[in-house]
Amino acid sequence: MNVVSTERLLLRPLEWADREAYAAFRFHPEVARWLSPVDRDPLAASEATIARFQSGWSTRGYAPWGVFCDGRLIGQCGLNFVPEFEATEVLWALHPDFWGKGYATETARAALAYGFDTLALKLIFAMTRPDNLASQAVMRRLGLLYRKNVVYKGMNAVWLDIDRARWTG
């Protein structure tokens, strides 16, 4: 199992037992507004997401982790292959109680290190809605550069990326 510890957090693959805690964080109204909408119940959606993440770990050797603080699931972060772009993204989402504490930067930095140093990926991108300035600030803090606007799952997004040569950890 691919477990990563940061200075303050534990990142580990999500398990079936995490599905209710995952649904509670992921479909919190302040989190859901930034992510793609879901047209089914939160528990079913969290079960499908955990199954997809587990498949990513099995087939690619990476997928988003659950982010744990003092044993509590507070979010997700990690690498995600996006077939529509044939590229790997770094993503994060945290429960609002944990915003503004530097956790997004801390976990995304760990995910980028895993992608470049462990998996030897050549390029990692991130995308978010144009009005999500907090996530864009995290991206820039980590060295990602704006490249283009894209449409993903019907939503407008900005695309920033970083390549292994520019990654400084």
Q: Which residues does each predicted region cover?
A:
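Short glycine-enriched, charge-decorated loop/helix-capping segments at active-site entrances
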Residues: 38-40
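Active-site rim helix/loop that mediates acceptor-substrate recognition in acyltransferases
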Residues: 42-60
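Acyl-donor (CoA/ACP) binding surface of acyl/acetyltransferases
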Residues: 1-34, 51, 64-169
